[in-house]
């Protein structure tokens, strides 16, 4: 109580020290509202568009009630608007059953995906030993082929040196031209040998088939 009295006295003292021509602050009175609803002129181009729709009518009815002249039934949404609102609500605010079903479908899809991935991994692991064997065999074949090419090229170079003489530089154009000619003949010879082996294999297969079915070979031709 004593503290409030001292505070009041200090405020009075401050007011007494003000200049004679000064006065205390006085707020303006709040603007007076019109006693009734205000309806904008639809012909006025400066009228905001939202004031010409049902939203503004709803505000006037909420403020003035029946004095606004708004029919309450006109504020309800139309059947089409209700359907749109219901569709929007179902999309953004689904029911608990819908959310549970969506979660169940998602979990089933994830489980199916996991099982397929595990099955794929198991199949790959089962194929891994054979894949390693095939890879090792391929590496061995590549190495053997590289060694054979290296030996063949060394043999052709030695043959070219015997034909041209050992004093000829292997980097010379004459030596390289002869080496290319020898390689061409070598490839032709290998191709002919391969074709010959294929013909011999076909002939052997035909002879084996005839030997297994002698009746067919001895049948008279019409």
Swiss-Prot record:
<dbReference type="GO" id="GO:0005762">
    <property type="term" value="C:mitochondrial large ribosomal subunit"/>
</dbReference>
<keyword id="KW-0131">Cell cycle</keyword>
<feature type="coiled-coil region">
    <location>
        <begin position="99"/>
        <end position="212"/>
    </location>
</feature>
<feature type="compositionally biased region" description="Low complexity">
    <location>
        <begin position="203"/>
        <end position="212"/>
    </location>
</feature>
<comment type="function">
    <text>Acts as a negative regulator of G1 to S cell cycle phase progression by inhibiting cyclin-dependent kinases. Inhibitory effects are additive with GADD45 proteins but also occur in the absence of GADD45 proteins. Acts as a repressor of the orphan nuclear receptor NR4A1 by inhibiting AB domain-mediated transcriptional activity. May be involved in the hormone-mediated regulation of NR4A1 transcriptional activity. May play a role in mitochondrial protein synthesis.</text>
</comment>
<keyword id="KW-0175">Coiled coil</keyword>
<dbReference type="InterPro" id="IPR018472">
    <property type="entry name" value="Ribosomal_mL64"/>
</dbReference>
<dbReference type="GO" id="GO:0032543">
    <property type="term" value="P:mitochondrial translation"/>
</dbReference>
<protein>
    <recommendedName>
        <fullName>Large ribosomal subunit protein mL64</fullName>
    </recommendedName>
</protein>
<feature type="short sequence motif" description="Nuclear localization signal">
    <location>
        <begin position="184"/>
        <end position="200"/>
    </location>
</feature>
<feature type="region of interest" description="Disordered">
    <location>
        <begin position="188"/>
        <end position="222"/>
    </location>
</feature>
<dbReference type="GO" id="GO:0005759">
    <property type="term" value="C:mitochondrial matrix"/>
</dbReference>
<feature type="compositionally biased region" description="Basic residues">
    <location>
        <begin position="25"/>
        <end position="36"/>
    </location>
</feature>
<dbReference type="InterPro" id="IPR043035">
    <property type="entry name" value="Ribosomal_mL64_sf"/>
</dbReference>
<comment type="subunit">
    <text>Component of the mitochondrial large ribosomal subunit (mt-LSU). Mature mammalian 55S mitochondrial ribosomes consist of a small (28S) and a large (39S) subunit. The 28S small subunit contains a 12S ribosomal RNA (12S mt-rRNA) and 30 different proteins. The 39S large subunit contains a 16S rRNA (16S mt-rRNA), a copy of mitochondrial valine transfer RNA (mt-tRNA(Val)), which plays an integral structural role, and 52 different proteins. Interacts with GADD45A, GADD45B and GADD45G. Interacts with NR4A1 via the NR4A1 AB domain. Interacts with ATAD3A and ATAD3B.</text>
</comment>
<keyword id="KW-0539">Nucleus</keyword>
<feature type="region of interest" description="Disordered">
    <location>
        <begin position="19"/>
        <end position="46"/>
    </location>
</feature>
<comment type="subunit">
    <text>(Microbial infection) Interacts with the human papilloma virus type 16 (HPV 16) minor capsid protein L2.</text>
</comment>
<keyword id="KW-0496">Mitochondrion</keyword>
<dbReference type="GO" id="GO:0005743">
    <property type="term" value="C:mitochondrial inner membrane"/>
</dbReference>
<dbReference type="Pfam" id="PF10147">
    <property type="entry name" value="CR6_interact"/>
</dbReference>
<keyword id="KW-0689">Ribosomal protein</keyword>
<keyword id="KW-0945">Host-virus interaction</keyword>
<dbReference type="GO" id="GO:0005654">
    <property type="term" value="C:nucleoplasm"/>
</dbReference>
<dbReference type="GO" id="GO:0005739">
    <property type="term" value="C:mitochondrion"/>
</dbReference>
<comment type="similarity">
    <text>Belongs to the mitochondrion-specific ribosomal protein mL64 family.</text>
</comment>
<keyword id="KW-0687">Ribonucleoprotein</keyword>
């Amino acid at each position: 109580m004593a503290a409030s009295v001292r505070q009041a006295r200090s405020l009075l003292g401050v007011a007494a020290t003000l200049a004679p021509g000064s006065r205390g602050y006085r707020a303006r009175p709040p603007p007076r509202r019109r006693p009734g609803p205000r309806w904008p002129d639809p012909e006025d181009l400066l009228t905001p568009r939202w004031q010409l729709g049902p939203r503004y009518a709803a505000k006037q009815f909420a403020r003035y009630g029946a004095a606004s002249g708004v029919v309450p039934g006109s504020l309800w949404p139309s059947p089409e608007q209700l359907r749109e609102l219901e569709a929007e609500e179902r999309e953004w605010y689904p029911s608990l059953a819908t959310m549970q079903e969506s979660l169940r479908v998602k979990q089933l899809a994830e489980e199916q995906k996991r099982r397929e991935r595990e099955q794929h991994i198991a199949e790959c692991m089962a194929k891994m030993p054979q894949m390693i064997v095939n890879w090792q065999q391929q590496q061995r074949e590549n190495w053997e082929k590289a060694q054979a090419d290296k030996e063949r090229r060394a043999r052709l170079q030695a043959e070219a040196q015997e034909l041209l003489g050992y004093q000829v530089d292997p980097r010379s154009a004459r030596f390289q031209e002869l080496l290319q000619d020898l390689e061409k003949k070598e490839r032709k010879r290998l191709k002919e040998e391969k074709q010959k082996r294929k013909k011999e294999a076909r002939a052997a297969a035909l002879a084996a088939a005839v030997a297994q079915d002698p009746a067919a070979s001895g049948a008279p031709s019409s």
